[in-house]
């Protein structure tokens, strides 16, 4: 590593946010020390020492930049030279309208890029407690599984209890163990996505009787017991365990991950399934499939017993069973400033899921902007924030000031959030007419509004890049 010691940016945690942050700092010509505690100290969810390991789904969700907020975030990150998006694009697997990746190939690509960069040094070992006082420019991206000593140190520094919720992991099945005389390949509404062909999911149909028996088994199944300190931790609604969804009502799953719409069983095309379980490709070879929406806290034996009652999965062999881990995040609007710095100690900047964003892409995007801010600090410059009209700017706004504490005071009023168009400022003038001059009606208005917001976001981001950002050539 070259460059003066005082200019080094320390990034703690090499998940998606930390990896992206380190990449952006180095790409701007500033040296980086990237700290990762694995494999010296593992977490309850990680299984490798690879950087940017995906511990939950392998999906980056929609890649549609014109109509979907997360697809727009993909596009913005690509414009900013995101390593995470580059690795995802290079390791994509078919997934209908979504961008899904081979998790091992993805992690390997990120690890290699960071290892090979001359301005990045990777230090393996835990940072126990706050970073040393002489580290003047630090990005803390330790994620939802932050080790206890560091979490305790942050809590003491801020005099604020970290918030927490549970995040559950879906099981992965070996493709060859799925009975394709019962199941079939099809994407919902035959939608074609990145690297896909419109038949990217494996579908397992259920009759009404099978569905009702399955729901009853989920509710009755033996669950993982909570530790005493975990009993009051809420779930994030975007990653609810399937048995918790089942407990909310007998029809909940049929209107959620098991909805039977947009699919036709080629084995029995005249019979409409009452519910359908979908599996999504999990690796590039197509040998592993994860059960979509089936994150769970059922005990391992119960998972195998209950999930093998699904038609087509009677002989399923599991590469990984579902699990549960505790996620922690900060009350960011109160604790962080507009550039993600800790108000109580501005040398510390936070990034990723612990800031209160939810999702792989969102975490990486906050790492991206944190890296740009830190690089500017190292050069003695101040970087203007991305426009609020962009996906990056709107997510940053939610984290650092988008929540009005006085409306709903209390320790749990700020909650994790996926990127969505509801975080964007309203359009000054929403479209009302089609290109041919006829009036937009019903859902057409919603579609046109999203497309207008996306177009404005990309135009404003391009102007911001040109006006405020020095994009160094990737090493």
UniProtKB/Swiss-Prot annotation:
Enzyme class at the top of the EC tree: transferase
Entry-linked InterPro entries: FAD/NAD-bd_sf, MnmG-rel, MnmG-rel_CS, MnmG_N, TrmFO
One MF annotation (Gene Ontology) recorded for this entry: tRNA (uracil(54)-C5)-methyltransferase activity, 5,10-methylenetetrahydrofolate-dependent
Binding sites annotated in the UniProt record for FAD: 13-18
Swiss-Prot/TrEMBL catalytic activity: uridine(54) in tRNA + (6R)-5,10-methylene-5,6,7,8-tetrahydrofolate + NADH + H(+) = 5-methyluridine(54) in tRNA + (6S)-5,6,7,8-tetrahydrofolate + NAD(+); uridine(54) in tRNA + (6R)-5,10-methylene-5,6,7,8-tetrahydrofolate + NADPH + H(+) = 5-methyluridine(54) in tRNA + (6S)-5,6,7,8-tetrahydrofolate + NADP(+)
Co-factor requirement: FAD
S-S pairs: none
PROSITE patterns: GIDA_2 (PS01281)
Protein location: Cytoplasm
Predominant cellular place of this UniProt entry's protein: cytoplasm
GO terms, biological process: tRNA methylation; tRNA wobble uridine modification
GO annotation, cellular component aspect: cytosol
This enzyme's EC code(s): 2.1.1.74
Keywords: Cytoplasm, FAD, Flavoprotein, Methyltransferase, NAD, NADP, Transferase, tRNA processing
Function: Catalyzes the folate-dependent formation of 5-methyl-uridine at position 54 (M-5-U54) in all tRNAs.
Family membership: Belongs to the MnmG family. TrmFO subfamily.
Protein name: Methylenetetrahydrofolate--tRNA-(uracil-5-)-methyltransferase TrmFO
Organism per entry: Bradyrhizobium diazoefficiens (strain JCM 10833 / BCRC 13528 / IAM 13628 / NBRC 14792 / USDA 110)
Gene from which this protein is expressed: trmFO
